């Protein structure tokens, strides 16, 4: 899936730009997907690359969407983040190099990980719209 990063960045709203391009964080419990339960795919708002599925989403009570794992580990980069007087692991999209959020080791099993991701860094594609939106190759992820 080809994309024009410069054009896509111009189309972002203020919060999406702040989060993805300036490593910002949106307010907890006041974002689009923190309590979203619909079945589907969460893709990078900039590149459109599939990052997470609803199957790996869980309620971590932190106010941001949380996932146990990405669809493909190769699509996310992890970097040391020492901002704000903390030591954390930042999660960035590999293709667009956009800030997504952070990963912590306090998630449920078997991974034990919690990918705490800003809604502003994501676009949701409902399962029944995957083919229509060009994500037919991801339908197998939802087969039981």
Curated annotation (Swiss-Prot):
Belongs to the MsrB Met sulfoxide reductase family. Keywords: Oxidoreductase. GO terms for cellular component: cytoplasm. One of its GO terms (molecular function) is peptide-methionine (R)-S-oxide reductase activity. The gene is msrB. The active site is at residue 116. This is Peptide methionine sulfoxide reductase MsrB. It catalyses: L-methionyl-[protein] + [thioredoxin]-disulfide + H2O = L-methionyl-(R)-S-oxide-[protein] + [thioredoxin]-dithiol. Its EC number is 1.8.4.12. Pfam families: SelR (PF01641). One of its GO terms (biological process) is protein repair. The lineage of its organism: Bacteria, Bacillati, Bacillota, Bacilli, Bacillales.
């Amino acid at each position: 899936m080809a994309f024009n990063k410069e054009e896509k960045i111009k189309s972002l709203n203020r919060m999406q730009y702040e989060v993805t391009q300036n490593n910002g964080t949106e307010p907890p419990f006041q974002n689009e997907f923190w309590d979203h339960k619909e079945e589907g795919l969460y893709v990078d708002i900039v590149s459109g690359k599939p990052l997470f599925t609803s199957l790996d989403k869980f309620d971590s009570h932190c106010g941001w969407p949380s996932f146990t794992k990405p669809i493909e580990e190769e699509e996310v980069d992890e970097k040391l983040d020492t901002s704000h007087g903390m030591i954390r692991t930042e999660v960035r999209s590999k293709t667009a190099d956009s800030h997504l959020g952070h990963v912590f080791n306090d998630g449920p099993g078997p991974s034990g990980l919690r990918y705490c991701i800003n809604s502003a860094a994501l676009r949701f594609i409902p399962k029944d719209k995957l083919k229509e939106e060009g994500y037919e190759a991801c339908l197998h992820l939802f087969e039981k």
